[in-house]
Amino acid sequence: MTENLISSTIDSLDNQSPDRGKTALVLGGGGARGYAHLGIAQVLRDAGIEPDLVVGTSMGSVIGAAVANRADLDGMVKVLTRLDVNQILKISQESRRELEKAIGRSLVREFGVRRRLRGETNDPPVKLARLFTFFKLMTKNSSFSELPIEYAAVATDLETGTEVIINEGKVYEATAASSAIPGFIPPVKLNGKLLIDGGVVDTVPIL
């Protein structure tokens, strides 16, 4: 079924006129399930179809950054398919999604939890420095202005609970902010805001 859907999408794009406007690849969250984005992106690339814009949230922002940077998707597939974050954390897809939403709603109301995530109390299990190092390597430490394909990441403002679109500055910071799972990864301070996983407010971003 997925193969038929991808095939139909490719045929539809091939048949569109040159003045169709911009084509956007929108990648949502979903933890380990987000790895499927890599396969779709690779199929589109193999078909010679490149989006004008890539938008991602949570795991989708990680894959989206790679697509926008024209990274080696085959190499990423080999690395990421060996990892299953949800399995390691013993959290099902449904539970993780509900947990993110519940924690996210709580975070924007409870100042004490915000203090904890700022690092004023116990540290979350994932160190931000390690995440930054990984995303720096993955994105070649690129700035948004250096990307060959236009890209935007979606994050959540910890203070207000509102959606934040990031499309300037360093790509690794935006990707880290968009995928900062509440309670597991510290929020990312960017442009004066504390940002967490974009999936809290928008699982599939539409700009």
Task: Give residue ranges: language-model regions.
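Patatin-like phospholipase
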Residues: 1-57, 65-207
